[in-house]
Amino acid sequence: VVTITLNLANPSKGQYSSFVDRIRNNVRDPKLKYGGTDIAVIGAPPTREKYLRINLQGPRGTVSLGLRRENLYVVAYLAMDNTNTNKAYYFRNQITSAELRTVFPEATATNQIVIQYGEDYQSIERNAQITQGSQSRKELGLGIDLLVTSIDGVNRKARVVRNEARFLLIAIQMTAEAARFRYIQNLVTFNFPKKFDSDNKVIQFEVSWGKISRAIYGDCKNGVFNKDYDFGFGKVRQAKQLQMGLLMYLGRPG
C-alpha cells in the first residue's frame, strides 16, 4: 500500500501543498483528459492496490487514514488508544477486515473496530454533536492548527465518538477534499497554519464533485461549458473558474 505522510510537527505551506499534490498524483491517470482541460482525472477502479494510506504525523503522535483510490473516500483510520494499542476503526461497507489488515498491519483482527455510523457527512456530523449555527462541519472550520488539535483528540486516548467524528470531518476535508478542490487547498495555504472559518463555497464544492465532474466530462469543450452552470456559488462558463484539482472517473472521454 502506498503511504503518503504529512509532517505536522513543523509544517510549512509548501509541505502541505506537495502532500495534497502527492495524493492527487497517486490516484490520477495522466492519460485521461476531460472537456479539453488539464484537470487531473482519477484512474479506472484498480483491481489491486485499491487503497492509499495517509500518515498524519502530529507533534504528539501519528494518526493514519485509509482512502479508496477509486474515489478518495476515507474508509478507516488508525490510532493508538490510551493503553498504547494500535486500533483500526473502519466503515464496514467500504472495506473488509482482510483489506484493512493490508492498509494497517499494526492493528490485529481483534483490534479492528467497526464504526457504527455511516461514512456520509450527515452521519458523521450527527455524531460530532456540533451545536452552533448550521450544526454542520462548516462550523468547525479548517486549518493546520485545527487538524493538529483534532488528531490530539483521538491519539493515545480512550475512544470518544464525538472527538472521532470531529477528527474525521476535518481530516477528510484537508486530505481528500483538498485533493479534489484546489479552492480548499488554497484556503489552507492562504491561512497557514491558522484555523479559519469555512464558508458556504467549501460545502457547495464538496457536495458537487459528481455534478462538476459530469459537466466537464459531458458538456465542456476546450475548457468551456456549452452553457452557464451554477453549482451553488454563481454562474460559471469556464472550467478553470472552478479551480478543480481532481475529477471523478467517468470512463474514457466521449
From Swiss-Prot:
Key word Hydrolase present: yes
Transmembrane segments: none
GO biological processes: defense response; negative regulation of translation
Domain of life: Eukaryota
Catalytic activity: Endohydrolysis of the N-glycosidic bond at one specific adenosine on the 28S rRNA
Example GO molecular function: rRNA N-glycosylase activity
Expressing tissues: Expressed in seeds; most abundant in the perisperm.
Alphabetized UniProt keyword annotations: Hydrolase, Plant defense, Protein synthesis inhibitor, Toxin
EC number: 3.2.2.22
Role played: Exhibits N-glycosylase activity. Catalyzes the release of one adenine from a ribosome. Acts as a ribosome-inactivating protein and inhibits protein synthesis. Induces cell death in Huh-7 liver cells. May contribute to the protection against plant pests and predators or play a role in regulating the death of plant cells.
Note from the entry: Thermostable at 68.9 degrees Celsius.
Protein name per the record: rRNA N-glycosylase sapovaccarin-S2
Record organism: Gypsophila vaccaria
